């Protein structure tokens, strides 16, 4: 049986931490910044850790060798 490929969109969007958690970028900063408060915009910087239930789905379906 051939090797499974990791989804190319998953490679670009997610990284695994050393402890096996899934790190992802923050959502909600593509457009419409004028209506958001400065605090909201500031708190959306950087990355965050994905929830366990969602992370399990990402790893199982899209990252076969993670």
Swiss-Prot record:
Q: Which GO terms describe its biological process?
A: translation
Tell me the Gene3D superfamilies matching this sequence. Answer: 4.10.410.60
Gene Ontology cellular-component terms for this entry are: cytosolic large ribosomal subunit
Assigned keywords, A-Z: Ribonucleoprotein, Ribosomal protein
Q: Name one GO molecular function term.
A: structural constituent of ribosome
Q: Which InterPro entries match?
A: Ribosomal_bL35, Ribosomal_bL35-like, Ribosomal_bL35_sf
NCBIfam families assigned: rpmI_bact
HAMAP family noted in UniProt: Ribosomal_bL35
Q: Which family does it belong to?
A: Belongs to the bacterial ribosomal protein bL35 family.
UniProt-recorded name of the protein: Large ribosomal subunit protein bL35
């Amino acid at each position: 049986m051939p090797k499974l490929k990791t989804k190319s969109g998953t490679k670009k969007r997610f990284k695994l931490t050393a402890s096996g958690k899934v790190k992802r970028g923050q959502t909600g900063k593509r457009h419409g910044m004028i209506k958001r408060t400065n605090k909201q915009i500031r708190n959306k910087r950087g990355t965050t850790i994905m929830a366990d239930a969602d992370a399990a789905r990402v790893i199982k379906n899209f990252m076969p060798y993670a």
